[in-house]
C-alpha cells in the first residue's frame, strides 16, 4: 500500500524527501552553529550536532506515517476495509506498519546523511556508518512504539496535538541531539540521560 501511495504521489513525495533535510539543516543546524561554536569537549558544533540532525530528521519522517495509520484514520473511521478484514493479527499489522514507517524514515535519514556530509567537514568510516544505522534503528523502534501507543490511547485532536508537542520538545531538547545534557540541572540531567529515547543516541556518541 505504501508503494501504491508513493506511485500516485511521486513528485510531491520526492520533493519533500529532498526538501526536509535542507529545511532541518537551514532552520536548526546553521543558526545553532553561530550560537554554540564548540561542544563542552571542544568539538566544533557542526560536527558534534551531525548525528543529532540525522536522528531529528528520522523522527520528523516517522511521525506523519504512524499518525495517519493509527490516529487520523481511526478517529475519522476511515480504516481501509481490506486492512480491517485481514486474517493477520492486530499485533502483526501494527508491527508491519512500524517496520514500513521505520524503513521510510531510514531512507530520509540516508539522504540527509549524504547531504550533510557534503556540507559538514566530517568523515564517516564504514564501521561508524553501520553503527549509526544500528542505533538509529533501535531509536526508531522505541519512538515508533511511543507514537503508536499515544495515537491509540488518545481520541481527541486537541489532546493529541498537545501531547505530541511535548513529545517533540523532548525529542529536540531532551535527548542530547542539539544541546548537551550538562546544560540541565543535575537531577533533570540524570532523568534525561536514562529515559529510553536518549540511550541509542548516547551509545553512538
Predicted features along the sequence, with ranges:
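Membrane-interface helix termini and inter-helical loops of multi-pass transporters
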Residues: 32-41, 117-127, 185
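Hydrophobic alpha-helical transmembrane segments of membrane proteins
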Residues: 31-73, 134-153, 171
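Transmembrane helix segments
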Residues: 30-32, 153-194, 198
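Alpha-helical transmembrane segments and their short interhelical loops
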Residues: 90, 94-164, 169
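Hydrophobic alpha-helical transmembrane segments of multi-pass membrane transport/permease proteins
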Residues: 8-34, 47-63, 106, 166-173
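Hydrophobic alpha-helical transmembrane segments of multi-pass membrane transport proteins
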Residues: 46-118
Amino acid at each position: 500500500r505504501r508503494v501504491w501511495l508513493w506511485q500516485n504521489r511521486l513528485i510531491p513525495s520526492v520533493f519533500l524527501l529532498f526538501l526536509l533535510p535542507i529545511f532541518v539543516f537551514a532552520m536548526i543546524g546553521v543558526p545553532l552553529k553561530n550560537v554554540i561554536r564548540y561542544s563542552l569537549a571542544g568539538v566544533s558544533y557542526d560536527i558534534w550536532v551531525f548525528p543529532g540532525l540525522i536522528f531529528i530528521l528520522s523522527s520528523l519522517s516517522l511521525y506523519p506515517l504512524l499518525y495517519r495509520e493509527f490516529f487520523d484514520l481511526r478517529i475519522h473511521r476511515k480504516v481501509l476495509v481490506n486492512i480491517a478484514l485481514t486474517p493477520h493479527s492486530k499485533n502483526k499489522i501494527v508491527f508491519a506498519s512500524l517496520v514500513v514507517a521505520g524503513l521510510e524514515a531510514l531512507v530520509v535519514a540516508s539522504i540527509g546523511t549524504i547531504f550533510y556530509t557534503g556540507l559538514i567537514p566530517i568523515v564517516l568510516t564504514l564501521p561508524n556508518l553501520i553503527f549509526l544505522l544500528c542505533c538509529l534503528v533501535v531509536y526508531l523502534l522505541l519512538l515508533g512504539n511511543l507514537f503508536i501507543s499515544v495515537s491509540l490511547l488518545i481520541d481527541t485532536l486537541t489532546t493529541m496535538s498537545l501531547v505530541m508537542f511535548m513529545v517533540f520538545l523532548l525529542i529536540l531538547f531532551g535527548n542530547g541531539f542539539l544541546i548537551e545534557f550538562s546544560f540541565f540541572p543535575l537531577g533533570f540531567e540524570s532523568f534525561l540521560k536514562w529515559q529510553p529515547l536518549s540511550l541509542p543516541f548516547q551509545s553512538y556518541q
